Amino acid sequence: MGSKEDVGKGCPAAGGVSSFTIQSILGGGPSEAPREPAGWPARKRSLSVSSEEEEPEEGWKAPACFCPDPHGPKEPSPKHHTPIPFPCLGTPKGSGGAGPAASERTPFLSPSHPDFKEEKERLLPAGSPSPGPERPRDGGAERQTGAAKKKTRTVFSRSQVYQLESTFDMKRYLSSSERACLASSLQLTETQVKTWFQNRRNKWKRQLSAELEAANMAHASAQTLVGMPLVFRDSSLLRVPVPRSLAFPAPLYYPSSNLSALPLYNLYNKLDY
């Protein structure tokens, strides 16, 4: 309690020492020291984290110099002091974003900026497709064109097929005039008649090649057959025609037979056909 009373008593004494004249406020006197450094202890105290627990410094023990004189003019409040600029923190909130620091801290980059692509690649995942203009979906149009290109099969009546088959048996190839005459008689187009004759010729060629191959196989199998004598019981021989040029040096033996062992060529010379 005693210290508070001493502080309160010291305020009027300070008013007698300091002179609040226009010259002292404007700093015109050469002998008087500037008053600005006296405000630094208060700023240091306000910027400290634990200002209440810290002990006051040596310069802080005379708060009488900050007490306003009730009889003199009021000193301007320290709130109106120009804030100290900190370039590393950027522009203050009240400045409205003006100045070079605001333009440097803007997060938006134009697409033509060289760092724009690097930033986009860093933000987008590796497997995600990059955003771009959507390609038109032409799947439906392609399917429609594919369906239109597919040829339809012409269905012929029995009378038309009979007339076409009869003409094909007589002549495999038709001239343009014959094709036009046949198409007009059957109420068909020349393209339909031409396509039918092409398919019929292909079928006819396949049939010919199959028949020729079957004939060749039969002829080859007939050439490999050779007649040989077969032995049945009672030594009866089944006479099979064998060329006389075939001769075997080893004699043939027949069981339970009265014939002597003779060479095969001698046996066939004695047999009557």
Curated annotation (Swiss-Prot):
Entry's Gene Ontology molecular function annotations: DNA-binding transcription factor activity, RNA polymerase II-specific; sequence-specific double-stranded DNA binding
CDD domains the UniProt entry points to: homeodomain
Region Disordered, residue ranges: 1-154
Phenotype upon gene inactivation: Mice display a perturbation in cell fate determination in the lateral aspect of the otic epithelium results in reduced cell proliferation in epithelial cells, which includes the vestibular sensory patches and semicircular duct fusion plates, as well as in the adjacent mesenchyme.
InterPro entries with a match to the protein in the record: HD, HD_metazoa, HMX_Homeobox_TF, Homeobox_CS, Homeodomain-like_sf
Key words, A-Z: Developmental protein, Differentiation, DNA-binding, Homeobox, Neurogenesis, Nucleus, Transcription, Transcription regulation
GO CC list: nucleus
N-terminal signal peptide: none
Subcellular locations according to the entry: Nucleus
DNA-binding span(s): 149-208
Tissues showing expression: Expressed in the developing CNS, including a specific expression in vestibular structures throughout inner ear development.
Sequence ranges of Basic and acidic residues compositional bias: 114-123
Keyword DNA damage: no
Main location: nucleus
One GO BP annotation of this record: brain development
Sequence similarity: Belongs to the HMX homeobox family.
PANTHER family, sorted: HOMEOBOX PROTEIN HMX, HOMEOBOX PROTEIN HMX2
Role, per record: Transcription factor involved in specification of neuronal cell types and which is required for inner ear and hypothalamus development.
Protein name: Homeobox protein HMX2
Organism: Mus musculus
Source species taxonomy: Eukaryota, Metazoa, Chordata, Craniata, Vertebrata
Gene this chain is encoded by: Hmx2
